[in-house]
Amino acid sequence: MKKQRNLRSMAAQAIEQVVEQGQSLSNILPPLQQKVSDKDKALLQELCFGVLRTLSQLDWLINKLMARPMTGKQRTVHYLIMVGLYQLLYTRIPPHAALAETVEGAVAIKRPQLKGLINGVLRQFQRQQDELLAEFNASDARYLHPSWLLKRLQKAYPEQWQSIVEANNQRPPMWLRVNRTHHSRDSWLALLDEAGMKGFPHADYPDAVQLETPAPVHALPGFEEGWVTVQDASAQGCMTWLAPQNGEHILDLCAGPGGKTTHILEVAPEAQVLAVDIDEQRLSRVYDNLKRLGMKATVKQGDGRYPSQWCGEQQFDRILLDAPCSATGVIRRHPDIKWLRRDRDIPELAQLQSEILDAIWSHLKSGGTLVYATCSVLPEENSLQIKAFLQRTADAELCETGTPEQPGKQNLPGAEEGDGFFYAKLIKK
């Protein structure tokens, strides 16, 4: 039996690691969830994701409720108060229980002398809630995005930035990809129905299913057997443009965690696939995904800027470059991105993308296809990146995705329930 732990203090410490130390919630949360009971896993996740989704609001409220911020060794208390405010604002947890558990969290983080302070701040919020929220809703902080990102979205999408921001602040739907080598989408949907769950097919992507209500993967028919994979619909769209064929040599570059590698092999089971990523941890997940789906690919660790180090002079029929990016299209799925990214990251990422594109182009056969993809919504990483590449690369031709003046296809967050995603299909003359 797992030891009873204070979830509020665990959430506060995790959020502090994200905001103060720049760590990814995707790395921090799973080990923490192993320490709590199954019924508490979901609540711990809700508290972490929820606070990070609404961080700017909670920060704004604390600044109104407290004379000065908590600093130094007491900084965790700042995040514990955030967890308390989030529960009062956004959950169905009875207020008395939310307060009691949050105040008790001070003991778990070895700050019992601050229980009274935490209790006082949260009770003050309860008394002034209507007045504070009215003031908050009249401020720019209501968009729940850092100002640098808000400015970039407003500049890039003067007519659509508000709908993008709104979509980013929602909980994402759960999308699945049916493994066509095992089942047709319709036959798997019938199995889902028999299991008492509902799913809906995507209009454009032939393997995509949206669950009516998100569910744990172990509850999905045939998940362990590889019949289905969790993958957003927009990410599945890459295969529409890549169109892999049996017998081809295909490179999946920046392949971790392996969702697109396995999708290539579902569409073209006899393709020769090389999956490459610079990150060892992400590569381990590529191996895990291949194993679960019973598939084989060559997997290598390598830097996309120096392909000769990991593939020599090899040429490929098709290349999928899922480029490292700001991930500004998947904020609803990873709300910590809002607080991990900085404005200065964008030109640095654009430079890295440019270097990888130039380096890998020489490894594409004449007549071959390269699909450039990102989960960003920022033009510097997307349309402007491809426009510049086309201008400096004489043998590159845009195909099916946009125009030379406005290259690529940009999906915005929430459009057709998918994540924000960009694709450009390039042919080598």
Swiss-Prot record:
In the Enzyme Commission scheme, what number(s) does this protein have? 2.1.1.176
Q: List the disulfide bonds.
A: none
Question: InterPro entries given for it?
Answer: MeTrfase_RsmB-F_NOP2_cat, MeTrfase_RsmB-F_NOP2_dom, NusB-like_sf, NusB_RsmB_TIM44, RCMT, rRNA_ssu_MeTfrase_B, rRNA_ssu_MeTfrase_B_ent, RsmB-like_ferredoxin
Residues binding S-adenosyl-L-methionine are: 254-260, 277, 303, 322
A single Gene Ontology CC annotation of this entry is: cytosol
Which compartments is it annotated to reside in? Answer: Cytoplasm
Task: Give the enzyme's main class according to its UniProt record, as a single word.
Answer: transferase
Q: Which PROSITE patterns match?
A: NOL1_NOP2_SUN, SAM_MT_RSMB_NOP
What SUPFAM superfamilies has UniProt attached to this entry?
NusB-like (SSF48013), S-adenosyl-L-methionine-dependent methyltransferases (SSF53335)
Q: Which Pfam families does the annotation name?
A: Methyltr_RsmB-F, NusB, RsmF-B_ferredox
The GO molecular function terms of this record are: RNA binding; rRNA (cytosine-C5-)-methyltransferase activity
- Provide the alphabetized UniProt keywords: Cytoplasm, Methyltransferase, RNA-binding, rRNA processing, S-adenosyl-L-methionine, Transferase
- List the catalytic activities from the record: cytidine(967) in 16S rRNA + S-adenosyl-L-methionine = 5-methylcytidine(967) in 16S rRNA + S-adenosyl-L-homocysteine + H(+)
Q: Which biological processes are named by the entry's GO terms?
A: regulation of DNA-templated transcription; rRNA base methylation
The record places the active site at 375 (nucleophile)
HAMAP family reported in the protein's UniProt record? 16SrRNA_methyltr_B
Q: What does this protein do?
A: Specifically methylates the cytosine at position 967 (m5C967) of 16S rRNA.
Give the family from UniProt.
Belongs to the class I-like SAM-binding methyltransferase superfamily. RsmB/NOP family.
Name of the molecule in the record: Ribosomal RNA small subunit methyltransferase B
Q: Which gene encodes it?
A: rsmB
